[in-house]
Amino acid sequence: MTRNGKACTAVLGGLMVIVAAFGALGITADEILDEMEDLFSVDADDTQGVLATMTMHNDYGNDVTSEYTLNLFELTTFDTTKPEDADEVTNVLMYFTGGDEEGSIFLMETPEDDAVDSRMWLYLPALGLTKELVSDEDQSGSFAGSSMSYGDLGSTGNLRDDYDATILREESIEVDGASYDVWVLELMAKPDADADYARVLTWVEKTDYLTLRMESYNDLGTLESEMAFVVLGEFEGDRVPEIIRSIDHGEGTISTVTISNLRRPDTPLTVDVFDPSGLGSIDPAAYGF
């Protein structure tokens, strides 16, 4: 995973997850991480999928900005022949609207099984071509003008594999005028792990296990990146982020993701929508965009 992978994981979790509450008495840091990982799981009877509109606004400094609007499709599929902790595959399709990127599509297939890598494709309408992003060079391209790469989006990973976690403290933080009780976790990179950062702090909300804030530091103790949920909303009774802001201090880029019109489709999505060979036929208007 590259530099913004952990912050990107939180962003994607905010986009695609329906969360569940869990009793918190006497909980350990590793148990909190397990619950955070479970945010990416959905019930096996949830076969409808989710639609949303996502706007990515990037501020590069010196009055230089960019903005992209994407139509988001998400569907989790299940393989009952596999173990319960490896039976899900999350399919995400992002359709670019407007500007030079009109009609471009990014498709990602992310297995729940940590031993299996995500697969990614990019559809280029001008060429009528779908390209799988396999090499590091392919995956290093900027996603929607941000400091996140395509590879970052495909790197959800397991925090427990790369970091030793402790509960640093408990406190309350404010998000959009409301106060939330959180655990502040300190994640220290394991000596033999290929971790992006030496130290990560996460502010995890105690009821829904949302990562409301994250700070990532290098081995010199310098803050390299941070992420925060700026505005929270509700979807089917659960709290979800509506505005997420990330800062890459190395590149001086501030990216703001706004999620709107989060909804179920009128007709359940099917896995055919996420077929790499059929991306050129996708019509967002058919899904209410």
Positions of the model-derived regions?
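Bacterial N-terminal signal peptides that target proteins for export
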Residues: 2-12
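Bacterial N-terminal signal peptides
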Residues: 10-20
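Flexible, processing/modification-adjacent segments and terminal tails
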Residues: 25-46, 53, 60-62, 110-198, ...
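Edge/loop elements at the starts and ends of beta-strands within beta-rich repeat scaffolds
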Residues: 40-48, 85-87, 236-238
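N-terminal, post-signal-peptide region of Sec/Tat-exported proteins
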Residues: 50-81
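Functional cores of ribonucleases/endoribonucleases
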Residues: 74-112
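Gly/Pro-enriched, hydrophobic low-complexity segments
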Residues: 97, 119-123, 129-135, 140-156, ...
